[in-house]
Amino acid sequence: MGRAVGIDLGTTNSVVSVLEGGEPVVIANAEGSRTTPSVVAFAKNGEVLVGQSAKNQAVTNVDRTIRSVKRHIGTDWSVAIDDKNYTSQEISARTLMKLKRDAEAYLGEDVTDAVITVPAYFEDSQRQATKEAGQIAGLNVLRIVNEPTAAALAYGLEKGEQEQTILVFDLGGGTFDVSLLEIGDGVVEVRATSGDNELGGDDWDQRIVDWLVEKFQSSNGIDLTKDKMALQRLREAAEKAKIELSSSQSANINLPYITVDADKNPLFLDETLSRAEFQRITQDLLDRTKTPFNQVVKDAGVSVSEIDHVVLVGGSTRMPAVTELVKELTGGREPNKGVNPDEVVAVGAALQAGVLRGEVKDVLLLDVTPLSLGIETKGGVMTKLIERNTTIPTKRSETFTTAEDNQPSVQIQVFQGEREIATANKLLGSFELGGIAPAPRGVPQIEVTFDIDANGIVHVTAKDKGTGKENTITIQDGSGLSQDEIDRMIKDAEAHADEDKKRREEQEVRNNAESLVYQTRKFVEENSEKVSEDLKAKVEEAAKGVEEALKGEDLEAIKAAVEKLNTESQEMGKAIYEADAAAGATQADAGAEGAADDNVVDAEVVEDDAADNGEDKK
């Protein structure tokens, strides 16, 4: 059995964590960072880039770079690249595949299982799509866990067995959640949760972009939103400015050559954004976090004074205005500073993976469903079977009847939401129960059962008590993928993984070959006096052979040329070694002679004629 990891699949960044000796460890990616940008790019040469490498080339490859795909998960969104449509699940799977690959490189063994986190306010279709993304990435998704719950799990287990009420304020790159939990004696119980799936750090970035566009247009008369590359540069500059304003009172945004005027003269963007101005243009976004907060406190039935700890989650909570608002909402309570807002969710997910695999004992996680679930009944009314903030897993049944005489079937339409009129809520799916025996209206008894599993995914069954006939569906949104589609995407992802691996190996061979040529020539230059001209020529010929092979696409030819250069280099090394050894011996002889000279008496040498006569002169 392979290892299990915890994954925080974020809008902006993603994190993977694993249990090592019972302790959660955040795994650094191949680039050495503990967070991986949730960015996927399709390079012109066919290579799929994920993470920092994808983010780095976004400006020059705008149309083929996808970011913040989490905002589209569970919808019918797709993106066309090279005449192929990619769903949000497939793009998310690319990020998950990189996290899986980096974890395997760190652990030295296969990663097969994962707990993946989602915003607490995610609907059923979004949870289902996240699970599908994990499957496409080759992961067995043990559980879908709410992000605030995972954060509380990571935070709470460090605090011992004392019972406490924790508020988790989670403002990420694309979503916002707030949850109230009770923790104690190994039990993490969610009391209430609320949120906004359309609110996150991306929106703060966009306000800065809009501000810059307006400033530039007023001074230059040019709308930068019409220029895709300029817009991408603005987005990147806005994100940096937002981060800078968390620690500084102002941020300078300088973008040279942002565009050209009508006469093709280059134009520069140079603006200074103060923290006060930034807070002014984003105040309404901040205000939107208040309603979910108040709703959670009301639903949980607690007063603000009963909250023991406040935990901030998500990089966007680093903004001073957010911290101040949380303090204001919680009666001046200082948020906990001992938690890394970028990593705590992944750590909690790794702990939950450990619980599910039996590696972590005596921990029970009791999560809730964020929205009410029900069906449409006569008059278009939303009849709720499961109220929001019900602990999951759960199962509820209710008996309904027909509205017309001799009605042969009933249409079951499943909705999620809080509105009294069914159509004002989110339609999760519908199915038909047929074969109802003819009878006056009000006589047939149709039992509808809602079953929510621990992942928060809904299963609905309708059963005619008279005939025993029943029909069951696992709710899938209109964008949901069939098993055949998931299987196809898994195969496609595996094929791309093989292609990517082959491409990486090819690049490594090329890089090593180029490095060998450089190092060999440098070595020859440094030891020029010790190598014969004949040997130098052979080595240079072999080096040119490698360079020639690198111009082509034949990997085996490159390897053969490298092998030849290695052979010639070894001969050169041998010759240099022998030359050094000979020089060493000569020096040793000279030293010995010098030592002998100390006992020699100076005298003239008188040649012996007889000896001369006896010499064989040539």
Swiss-Prot record:
Inducers of expression: By stress conditions e.g. heat shock.
Positions of post-translational Phosphothreonine modification: 175
Molecular function, one GO term: ATP binding
Entry keyword set: ATP-binding, Chaperone, Nucleotide-binding, Phosphoprotein, Stress response
SUPFAM superfamilies: Actin-like ATPase domain, Heat shock protein 70kD (HSP70), C-terminal subdomain, Heat shock protein 70kD (HSP70), peptide-binding domain
One Pfam family in the UniProt entry: HSP70
Function, in words: Acts as a chaperone.
Family listed: Belongs to the heat shock protein 70 family.
Protein name as it appears in the record: Chaperone protein DnaK
Native source species: Corynebacterium glutamicum (strain R)
Record lineage: Bacteria, Bacillati, Actinomycetota, Actinomycetes, Mycobacteriales
